[in-house]
Amino acid sequence: DDTSMTLALMKSLIDNKGFNPFDVQDNFLAWRDDVCFSYNGCFDIGVTTYKALEAYGEDKTTPFTGLTHKMSAGNGSIMRLSPVFCFYSKEQEKGRYVAVEQSKLTHAHPLCLEYSLKCADVVYEAFNGKLHQDILSQKGVHRDEVWSNGYVVNTYKAACWAISQTDNFKDALILAVNLADDADTVGAVTGMFAGALYGVESIPKEWVDSLVWSKEIVEGVELLYITGSDRRSNILTRRGWKHYELTS
């Protein structure tokens, strides 16, 4: 679900040349119901995300159907954030705003909004080659003190810890996913931070080449950055993530 929702958000930002919450939600529903943005369908979806999409599907008058109850402070909205910062790489305040707004689609708990904003701050500082204070504060933390479950606070801290203990993309990711528990999302957030800090060249080529739709994803990310920079019109398909037409 981490990758699928990331691709769904990425496509919407490209197609709309910015954040369109209704379109993002429609993409999320297409992933859940129509085998889109996933090679083999929606095989995993969080309870909070499912309930939010259910509410949106029943009444599409508002896209902001994120849950707010005390048990809904999960990590489902920070795991998909990376396209926002790639698109708004040169517009920090817009990026910070959209980071929070996209969370409200499925995860509207105050902690989810707060930590979406924290992720924005970490990434934008990393773009400038700086380590956020939340990463620096994790340097002396022992592995036994790190929790890697689905609670948004713990996921964020685990990702900061993995960055603090390493000095390159590969080692940060390996350390993060080996924390176990909610390994995919801790890895996704760590990858977002590490990618911003070390750059795309730091990602092992063999990892990229082994991905399903590797070429399409790489081209999509390039389009995302270009579109965010000049708002050029590009079209990607929803179904199967096939990249079939580019217009400018």
State where each predicted segment sits.
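Structured, active/binding-site neighborhoods that engage oxygen-rich ligands
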Residues: 1-248
